[in-house]
Amino acid sequence: MVEVMGISARSITVSTVGIVPGIRRLAEEPWPVSLAVSLHAADDELRSTLVPINKRYPLVELEAAAAEYFHKKRRRLSIEWTMMDGVNDTSEQAVKLAAIATRLRAHVNLIALNPTPLTRETASSESRIKAFARELGQRGVNVTVRDTRGRDIDAACGQLRVLAGKRGLTA
């Protein structure tokens, strides 16, 4: 498929919420793709409320699969972290996230939550996101604060799923 599309596999990142068997299967494939894990919380209690699949594949299993992927592929891992005010933008979460990112040698991408009619949470403030990024950086974690794009047309990360649901599509 990659050859047909004219895209180098090295330019492709596969993103997952943490389906452990899928990560392990991808590690066995010959393609040198990068892996991004949508983590959003650094402990099982909070992550299970934000990412329900965590109840099936808890952090210890997810981290083991991600480490296996890194060791087999030698491709950079990314951790995706949607910043939610008062939910996962605390110093406690930053410390826990830094420990996970360090063990996995992962790069962390922070992005403000995009509002949808289905979300109760609100985005962290720009100053809180920057402070969280500083906390990670001070612990030796490579971190990027991502720009939110497409929010004005309901096409940003997380918003398309809601739009697809309104149209009867599955995401």
Pin down the residues of each PLM region.
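Conserved AdoMet/S-adenosylmethionine-binding subsite of the radical SAM
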Residues: M1-R139, V143
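Radical SAM enzyme core and accessory elements
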Residues: Q138, T148-A171
